[in-house]
Amino acid sequence: MKERNESLDCLKGIAILLVMFGHVQVHNHMTDPYLYDVIKSIQMPMFFLISGYLAGTGKKITNLEQYRKKIGRRAVAYLLPFFSWLVVQHMTYVPQALRTVLFQLDYGLWFLMALFLFTVLCYTAQLLEAVTEKEIAFWAVWLTGCCVILVSYLAGVTFLSPSILIIYLPYYTVAYFVGRHREFVETYAPASMQRWIAGLCAVVFLVMVVMLDLVTVTGIGMLGVQTA
């Protein structure tokens, strides 16, 4: 039996608590100029970092049959609750709600759909890598998918909300690379250096929380507007 990573379990627990506390604030109309900025800026990026890292460290797709089975399991795990909650929440007008959520994912449990789309792209890239036996094939497929999402966002496409996907795709991508190449990262960035980098990033983040309205920052473009 594979040993669980207790550090990742702790991070997931922290992220879950942040999501709960953030939603308590929103639904009870509790306004705070800094606290919600901090929560919103940490909770979902943390989830996608963890998801990407686990995908990078986990067992890879090796054949088409395995690809089909894993996609099926992920569809049940992610899409079933996504659409079930939509039906429960909008029971009297499901068709209208369905049309809305497919073009505005944050109308529903958007995280599940976003994670499913990233997972499908990841498994597809892994399948091509297994066929060619070259890692470059994985990154070719992955970066092509990233470009499709970026172009869709820039073109104003709203189906499956590229505007949301483009925010969290970098977190998933970087974490996947780190998870897949842990030895490489540890060689060129030892633990002491990682702690210094993490501390510096934390300081920069806290300064951004104080100086900027991170709730409205939906990408590098908006960050540039606020700092101009």
Explain the meaning of each model-derived region.
Residues 1-147:
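Membrane-cytosol interface segments of multi-pass membrane proteins
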Residues 1-7, 183-195:
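Short, Lys/Arg-enriched, disordered terminal segments
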Residues 26-28, 59-62, 182-185, 211-214:
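Transmembrane helix-loop junctions in multi-pass membrane proteins
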Residues 30-35, 97-105, 151-163, 212-219:
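Membrane-interface helix caps and helix-loop-helix hairpins in membrane proteins
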Residues 44-58, 111-126, 157-188, 224-228:
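Specific transmembrane alpha-helix
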Residues 64-72, 181-190:
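Hydrophobic, small-residue-rich membrane helices and short re-entrant helix-turn-helix hairpins
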Residues 118, 122, 143-153, 170, ...:
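Hydrophobic, membrane-inserted alpha-helices
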Residues 187-228:
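Alpha-helical transmembrane segments and terminal signal-anchor/GPI-anchor hydrophobic tails
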